[in-house]
């Protein structure tokens, strides 16, 4: 049995994918795509190490703590070099998280090919006529290269010690004189690049219908000389709320609820009050940025409920406008947002009129990429 480690490349920004969710975070059942693709390959072989390359290592590690995670670079090649620093096995298998349907048949051909060369690469032939400029190319000489690719680790590390950028491992291996062996690829190993590719991937199943609830709470004291903002609405009052941002305590609680439902920490981690960039900033902008983050990892908001606790000022007449502000910022129907107001019956700092407290809940579901 060969000594092999697996590297899964998934640090791209999905710029060509054209959906609010990054492709690596599309849910296949309950698993994000990167995890589904990694599990698929790990069912075929007992790898020495499984290394996932990402820009979100800490968050990913919560899904698979038994894997190793490494931060990706600006290019595929730099990402691979970063991962290779953790590899000590004789061979390394490199694949993309965007190829979730690798078959056991293809995997076996790649492993068997290790007897033939230093690098084994799946490749497809083309059936269509091909041109380069105005010249017809002999299509029998054209190969469409796929992953996973199996290489001798020491040679691949050597091959990548260059400023020349390569788009796959075999190109780098050829450049240092390593032998390369092609095995017949598989159409089912198609790579997801744009959203139209999803229809070409046979093994994908729709996201599960699980829902996730988050709770957020925040409280601020009144401060004279500041504007009072609640749910993106300016309220005429003699006091505002003391804060680093605009002090919109309701949006802070809602932002925490949304982040919490996705397991993405809290508003203070994303927008620390020690950062001058966020001094006086609109909390609607912070909410939008937080929601983009939540969307990027595969969630969408179903509904949110906000309870504002204030002895004064009276805000009942502003509730519908507040709901519309939030719905507009998040591109949702207003009926998905509910704002309530209450007092604390003269109890506590709220009852004494010293400030405002808010509790919010948010309900998320997986983004449905099948629509």
Curated annotation (Swiss-Prot):
Its cofactor is a divalent metal cation. The record marks 16, 23, 244, 343 as: Transition state stabilizer. Pathway: Isoprenoid biosynthesis; isopentenyl diphosphate biosynthesis via DXP pathway; isopentenyl diphosphate from 1-deoxy-D-xylulose 5-phosphate: step 2/6; Isoprenoid biosynthesis; isopentenyl diphosphate biosynthesis via DXP pathway; isopentenyl diphosphate from 1-deoxy-D-xylulose 5-phosphate: step 4/6. A divalent metal cation binds at residues 218, 220, 252. 4-CDP-2-C-methyl-D-erythritol 2-phosphate binds at residues 218-220, 244-245, 266-268, 271-275, 342-345, 349, 352. Its EC number is 2.7.7.60, 4.6.1.12. Keywords: Isoprene biosynthesis, Lyase, Metal-binding, Multifunctional enzyme, Nucleotidyltransferase, Transferase. Pfam families: IspD, YgbB. It catalyses: 2-C-methyl-D-erythritol 4-phosphate + CTP + H(+) = 4-CDP-2-C-methyl-D-erythritol + diphosphate; 4-CDP-2-C-methyl-D-erythritol 2-phosphate = 2-C-methyl-D-erythritol 2,4-cyclic diphosphate + CMP. PROSITE patterns: ISPF (PS01350). Residues 212-371 are annotated as: 2-C-methyl-D-erythritol 2,4-cyclodiphosphate synthase. GO terms for biological process: isopentenyl diphosphate biosynthetic process, methylerythritol 4-phosphate pathway; terpenoid biosynthetic process. It comes from the Bacteria. HAMAP family: IspDF, IspF. In the N-terminal section; belongs to the IspD/TarI cytidylyltransferase family. IspD subfamily. In the C-terminal section; belongs to the IspF family. This is Bifunctional enzyme IspD/IspF. It comes from Campylobacter curvus (strain 525.92).
């Amino acid at each position: 049995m060969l000594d092999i480690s697996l590297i899964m490349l998934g640090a791209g920004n999905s710029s060509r994918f054209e959906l609010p969710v990054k492709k690596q975070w599309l849910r296949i059942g309950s698993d994000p795509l990167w995890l589904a693709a990694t599990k698929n390959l790990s069912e075929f072989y007992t790898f020495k190490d499984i290394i996932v390359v990402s820009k979100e290592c800490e968050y990913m590690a919560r899904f698979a703590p038994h894997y190793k995670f490494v931060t990706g670079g600006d290019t595929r090649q730099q990402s691979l070099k970063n991962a290779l620093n953790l590899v000590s096995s004789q061979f390394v298998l490199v694949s993309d998280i965007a190829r979730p349907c690798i078959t056991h048949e293809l995997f076996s051909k790649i492993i068997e090919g290790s007897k033939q060369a230093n690098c084994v690469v799946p490749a497809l032939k083309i059936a269509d006529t091909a041109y380069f400029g105005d010249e017809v190319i002999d299509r029998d000489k054209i190969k469409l290269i796929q992953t996973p690719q199996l290489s001798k680790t020491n040679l691949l590390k050597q091959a990548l010690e260059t400023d020349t950028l390569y788009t796959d491992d075999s190109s780098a291996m050829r450049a240092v004189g390593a032998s390369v062996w092609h095995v017949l690829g598989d159409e089912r190993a198609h790579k997801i690049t744009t959203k139209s590719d999803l229809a070409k991937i046979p093994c994908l199943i729709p996201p599960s219908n699980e829902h996730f609830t988050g709770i957020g709470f925040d409280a601020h004291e009144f401060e004279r000389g500041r504007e009072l903002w609640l749910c993106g609405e300016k309220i005429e009052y003699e006091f505002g709320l003391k804060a680093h941002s605009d002090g919109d305590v309701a949006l802070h609680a809602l932002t925490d609820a949304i982040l919490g439902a996705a397991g993405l920490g809290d508003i203070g981690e994303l927008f620390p009050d020690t950062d001058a960039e966020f001094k006086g900033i609109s909390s609607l902008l912070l909410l939008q940025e937080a929601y983009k983050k939540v969307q990027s990892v595969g969630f969408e908001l179903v509904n949110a409920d906000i309870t504002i606790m204030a002895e004064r000022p009276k805000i009942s007449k502003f509730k519908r406008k507040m709901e519309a502000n939030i719905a507009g910022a998040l591109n949702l129907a207003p009926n998905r947002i509910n704002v309530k107001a209450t007092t604390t019956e003269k109890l506590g700092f709220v009852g004494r009129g010293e400030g405002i407290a808010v509790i919010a809940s948010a309900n998320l579901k997986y983004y449905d990429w099948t629509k």
